[in-house]
């Protein structure tokens, strides 16, 4: 199955400059003004260049590889302290008449921010009014508006971004410290012959007077001054600050404001990407502008009412490692509109031409990305029920995202619901789920262990040479797949932990994610 990024690729990636934003203040406007969408002129478009990100050496295994795993920081939130003037962090092209197009750097007056993730705003540049995605803007003249400020991203996320081989030494970002409330951390890429590419983290401490410092001998009144100073002088850092770390536009929360149940006529199916037992997957466009993937379900696959109810839950699951559900056509044949992932399913990717070139560190990083998405599913008390390589989608730079979460329980086909029917994925299913229908996050953990064998064997069917009935019988009697060729014993041990008979003895996805963390990172004072 295939799927994607919701906007054309070119404007979604850019390398940031160190120049501070314009600090000019602008006045307000009448709050009663009605939306009037007009495309903003192109005079403010910032030149961009493509980039990838890199995943690093896993704890269990050596090396590191390319993999974009981090979305842009979530900067904007509820209006605080009466602040209504915001600055655009990215270009945004509206998709419906009530939305507002804007360019990076535009100042926007917020009219209404009480309607969730889409705010009513007025551009002080173009004079137009309409709805904007709230995660594309930040309060004017705030730390959140600085291009080098990444907010609450984790240490691991910062490492993934900074370990891009395209980044020169000294590429950096500032983030909130994970260990000290109110403090910040400066993360900087470095290189030496012994360690190769690595990341150093420097804690930025705050003075009682409001200033900031890394070392007490050199103090600054603001973070902006600190960054400006260290961009000219290393002064104890591994390297002076050179480039702001590149990142990608965040996903908007849905296709547009109030675009959830959409008319079938608004979708155009263009290229068939795949076909399964229950339907097809197409690359297409929504409203003639937005690249999406469209999953079409055969009539009778599931109840439209049950699907719509489940979809209301699914659309609230938002994580960088889950394929985003954009919209639905709820009448049969049901259409599910999701983000488009350019490389299709992980299973096809592993078995295809690109799979030949994947090495163990890359495969383990893909597993780490999947574990990250499933750790979120775990935290949300949700269950996938059909976790396997065929239901993982791959994008540019080896980005992996979990798809089809929750749909399995809605399927009404007898060959599937019988649990031992021809269409049921016995080889991926935990014994308690296959035999007794006990699907839990722990049965998903079992499936993840099977998925690890798919990764390490480049898409080989699990339990080679065995039929479904034999697999179920032998697994019940204690059989577990042996270590695949060229797979480290440490990784096979992780698989076996996932296949423990007692579901409660299986690890959590949080634990599994931690076991696949990068290790080529040097800590400095965090």
From Swiss-Prot:
Composition bias, Basic and acidic residues: 7-25
SH3 domain residues: 81-142
Domain Protein kinase: 267-517
Keyword Transferase in record: yes
Region: Disordered, residue numbers: 1-57
Residues where lipid is bound covalently (N-myristoyl glycine): 2
List of catalytic residues: 386
Chain positions with Phosphotyrosine modification: 416
Enzyme Commission (EC) number: 2.7.10.2
GO molecular function, one term: non-membrane spanning protein tyrosine kinase activity
Keywords assigned: ATP-binding, Kinase, Lipoprotein, Myristate, Nucleotide-binding, Oncogene, Phosphoprotein, SH2 domain, SH3 domain, Transferase, Tyrosine-protein kinase
Post-translational modification: The phosphorylated form is termed pp60v-src.
SH2 domain: residues covered: 148-245
Pfam families: PK_Tyr_Ser-Thr, SH2, SH3_1
Positions that bind ATP: 273-281, 295
Subunit annotation: Homodimer.
Biological role: This phosphoprotein, required for both the initiation and the maintenance of neoplastic transformation, is a protein kinase that catalyzes the phosphorylation of tyrosine residues in vitro. Causes mitotic slippage in addition to cytokinesis failure in the host cell. Phosphorylates and attenuates the activity of host CDK1, possibly causing the mitotic slippage.
Protein name: Tyrosine-protein kinase transforming protein Src
Originating organism: Rous sarcoma virus subgroup A (strain Schmidt-Ruppin) (RSV-SR-A)
